[in-house]
């Protein structure tokens, strides 16, 4: 358990350093919301975050505040919004730079578990070419794939 807590602390420390490098601040509440996302094994909606925040920290946080914090975390590449389920996950690459990675997500439709994976850029390029050939334009390179995880099969 101590190793797990140390791992989370290290992730939050990296996130704090990245924010400072960008001239922004990872405030206490932002750290707490990010911690909840990092600790969660599934994607969470803003309202689920409100509930978990109250359980973990004993304070109420309005949903609008959570949405503002989530927007900040997205802008800092510390969290991702999953449009397919309208929920959020912590970026799994917080501890290192991933400027060349395009986030791709496997989302379990039964338990909401999310796995962030890397897909070769050649596959994304080929997909984009196929989309263009079909007369469409790819608006987001982030893929969210509806799946069922091993535990739910």
Q: PLM features: what roles do these ranges have?
A:
Residues 31-36:
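Pre-recognition alpha-helix immediately N-terminal to the DNA-recognition helix
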Residues 22-24, 38-41, 56-57:
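Short helix-capping/hinge SLiMs at alpha-helix to coil transitions
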Residues 75-153:
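Non-DNA-binding regulatory cores of transcription-related proteins
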Residues 66-76:
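Basic amphipathic alpha-helical segments that dock to polyanions
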Residues 45-58:
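DNA-recognition alpha helix
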Residues 26-29:
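Short helix-coil-helix linker/hinge
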Residues 9-23:
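Short, Lys/Arg-enriched N-terminal segment that forms or immediately precedes the first helix
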């Amino acid at each position: 358990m101590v190793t797990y807590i140390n791992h989370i602390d290290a992730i939050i420390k990296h996130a704090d350093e990245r924010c400072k490098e960008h001239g922004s601040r990872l405030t206490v509440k932002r750290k707490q919301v990010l911690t909840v996302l990092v600790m969660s094994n599934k994607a969470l909606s803003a309202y689920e975050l409100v509930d978990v925040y109250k359980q973990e920290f004993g304070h109420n946080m309005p949903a609008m505040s959570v949405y503002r914090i989530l927007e900040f975390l997205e802008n800092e590449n510390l969290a991702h919004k999953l449009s397919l389920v309208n929920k959020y996950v912590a970026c799994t690459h917080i501890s290192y730079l991933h400027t060349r990675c395009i986030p791709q997500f496997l989302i379990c439709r039964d338990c909401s578990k999310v796995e962030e994976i890397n897909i070769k850029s050649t596959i994304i390029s080929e997909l984009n070419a196929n989309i263009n050939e079909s007369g469409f334009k790819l608006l987001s390179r982030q893929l969210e794939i509806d799946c069922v995880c091993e535990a739910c099969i």
